[in-house]
Amino acid sequence: MGQVLSEEKPAPLSHEEIVKELANIFAEKCFTSLELYSLKQVFKSLADHEQRVGYLKEGTVAKYLKVPGILDVSAVLFQMASYIAAFPFLEDAPAVLGLEQMVIVITLVTDRYRRVLGKRAADKTKLLFKSLAVYDRKFAKPAVDTPSHSKNAREQIGSDGQGLDNDELVLAAFDALGHVGSKKQQNMPAAHGAMIPGDNFRKLIMLLLLVAPLDGQDSLDSDPDRVTGAGLQSLRTAAESILAAFLDVEQNPGIEYHRFNKVIAGCLPFLFQGLAPLFEHFLFSKELDFHKGKGDTFRSPVMPPEPRQPLLQDTGSIMNASILSQMSFFIPGSFLFRRIRLLYAGDLDGFSMGSFETKVFNWRAPTILLVSGTRLLDESDHHSNGSVPAFWASLPPRRFPPGSSGEGERLAFGVYIFEPWKLTHRECFGGEETILFQLEPIHDLFRASPLNKDYVSFTRPSASTSHAGVSFGCPPPKPSQAYRRSGMIPLGPVSLMLDGSFEYGCFTHDYASSGGAFQTSMVREYNFQERLTLKAWRSGAAAGTRKQGTKQNNGRGKQEKLKLEGESTWGRATLKPTEHY
């Protein structure tokens, strides 16, 4: 015939075919055969069908995960899942939650993707932001619930800039797939005006606080007290404090990416970790029965599970389950949940440095100190002969305005101390693992600086010491007459000071200075100072199964005199020397 057949290039794969290929890779390398079987069984039992295509609806997902209706977060969670389901073609979002899409969602949310995409794709912050963001609130669209709406939704989203450019996670997925043509998707335009609505993020934070202590098979409805009454109020309070780190709701309608990324990296590195055990619920099918063989008619009895330690054995006027969850966003939850024990309570053991020393100093494990109080009014408003004027006089004359505008609002600070407590003579104690943080009314974090070692001091009252007390980030007392005559408490650039009576405290943030024991805030780039009258404070350390008792004494009389509510100390189990964070 003499004709040479020209080589025909294979037609490029469609988005659907590439997504299916990626889902197969994830399924093979990121799941066990039992997990895949369970996922298929769960999906089969939950899926609705349209045009012979199975998919999950918003209400179905929320009901299966037992998301409390009082949180009103189902739509936000479904929007996030539907966006991630379109990966790596995020311009196709929102996607229908079919079986393959659920494989992709679970792989990404639980961080299993690292087994395939490698270290290059270690951070999914951009993906999470885009999954929660809207690009024009006026035309914001709900997530797709059925296949028939999918095409129309894609057309509406169109080319308004669906994502932030240079997403390493997306690029790593294209590299893993090896489809050169797919890399054209790298050139998506950057999003303009993309932001997460503050109200949506508040709802999600409440859910994240709720799921933070859960294991893979724990249910969201296992502790109904957390979403009713005082438990619900504490969830809302913690969520408002965390939201305030991202956004001033009175000035901005939403959270932009640069702020989102900055706060997550600096203050809340573990914020989204609770989503992993939540979505792993899809990998546990209730239909699996390992106690029954083929053809067996008799089912062997199932041994009841061993009782678990409570999430928090002791609560107080500061410490509760929501505060514990909030701290787990920057201290690993494995250090906190079911591991902390009350060491010292001021309203039970007495408000004195001696009582504190007796209860805490023999503890040889890390501790957490929490302090709560009410902001003092301006110095000019105090004309009494009480202790307030004396406290004001002990502070250096250089004063900063408060960190927020609310008069008389509750303030809460804390310190994570890795080393055991000891008396301070000429040198402070503590190490670079020490963390100074604020919990209310705004969440903030001040990590230790390696340049200055004035981390923690505990100074007893004595004739040679003009000011006793507990301080963090302040220089230790000096044995000189000039120091004693000054009558001033030396405050560090970033520091927390509690006076010797545990009646007053002062937090200082000198943003313009450098060389302090703690780094300045990544959230508030300005100077501020909080002078407060202490209402409650506690410090913490936990230890395996060792229990620390508390006893009542005459501390309540002093509590009324000082208008204090409580004081306590918490501790956790001893860590191996290599365990740092």
From Swiss-Prot:
PROSITE patterns hit by this protein: TLDC (PS51886)
Region (Disordered): 539-581
GO cellular component: cytoplasm; nucleus
Biased composition regions of type Basic and acidic residues, renumbered to the chain: 557-566
Protein's cellular compartments: Cytoplasm
InterPro entries recorded: TLDc_dom
Pfam families membership: TLD (PF07534)
SMART domains: TLDc
GO BP term, example: response to oxidative stress
Family classification: Belongs to the RTC5 family.
Function: May be involved in a process influencing telomere capping.
Name of the molecule in the record: Restriction of telomere capping protein 5
